[in-house]
């Protein structure tokens, strides 16, 4: 009977966070913080500018939190940015940082791919391979699939939405609020 319960519980955890996802922090951290965000969402931009660096310093770098960013684009521009982040591969989080900090430069740009390619080159990525990736439909499908899974698994309808050790938290959060939520998850 215990084996059945363990197997059933592991099936519930599976969609929560895969060890294969590109993440910041220790894979075995006691807290997993997932953000469903959109690169053009003003509250997501604020989170990445003001809150995430502090969460990283106090929790991720200390091995207490594993952070995973999943795309939930709320505009066509955010879809393009999400694909660019996916195409950055192991430089995924560096590209997310670049995209969030330069959203005003690419949000309404006619040729977003040109801007994304410059950002990729600045990260040391192969520009030709990166541009080829941007036109690969697989990455767009991955972004759409991530968004559909978010709707199905966590009833995500807007951004930012956070999942902290399985607990769904919606809306903009300050560092103090995030700290409280993380500490609750630790205890």
Q: Over which residues does each language-model region extend?
A:
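Serine/threonine-rich low-complexity intrinsically disordered regions
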Residues: 2, 8-9, 18, 61, ...
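Extracytoplasmic thiol/disulfide redox context detector
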Residues: 2-75, 141-152, 183-187
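Glycine-rich, flexible loop/turn motifs
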Residues: 12, 18-20, 80, 102, ...
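General secondary-structure edge motif
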Residues: 21-24, 35, 39, 64, ...
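Short N-terminal micro-motifs specific to bacterial/archaeal maturation
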Residues: 24-27, 32-35, 86, 107, ...
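A structure-centric signal for secondary-structure junctions around beta-strands
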Residues: 28-30, 81, 158-159
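C-terminal cap of thioredoxin/glutaredoxin-like
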Residues: 38, 52, 118-187
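Structural alpha/beta surface segment adjacent to cysteine/selenocysteine redox centers
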Residues: 39, 45-121, 126
């Amino acid at each position: 009977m215990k084996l059945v319960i363990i197997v059933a519980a592991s099936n519930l955890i599976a969609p929560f966070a895969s060890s294969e996802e590109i993440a910041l922090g220790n894979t075995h951290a006691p807290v997993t913080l997932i953000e469903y965000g959109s690169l053009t969402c003003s509250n997501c931009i604020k989170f990445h500018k003001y809150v995430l660096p502090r969460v990283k310093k106090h929790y991720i770098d200390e091995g207490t939190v594993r952070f995973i960013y999943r795309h939930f684009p709320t505009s066509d521009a955010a879809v393009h940015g999400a694909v660019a982040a996916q195409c950055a591969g192991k430089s995924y989080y560096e590209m997310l940082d670049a995209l969030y900090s330069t959203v005003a430069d690419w949000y309404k740009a006619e040729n977003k791919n040109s801007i994304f390619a410059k950002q990729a080159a600045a990260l040391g990525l192969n520009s030709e391979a990166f541009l080829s990736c941007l036109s690969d439909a697989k990455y767009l499908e991955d972004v759409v699939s991530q968004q559909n899974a978010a709707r199905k698994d966590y009833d995500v309808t807007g951004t930012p939405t956070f999942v902290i050790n399985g607990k769904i938290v919606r809306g903009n959060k300050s560092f103090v609020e995030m700290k409280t939520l993380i500490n609750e998850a630790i205890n």
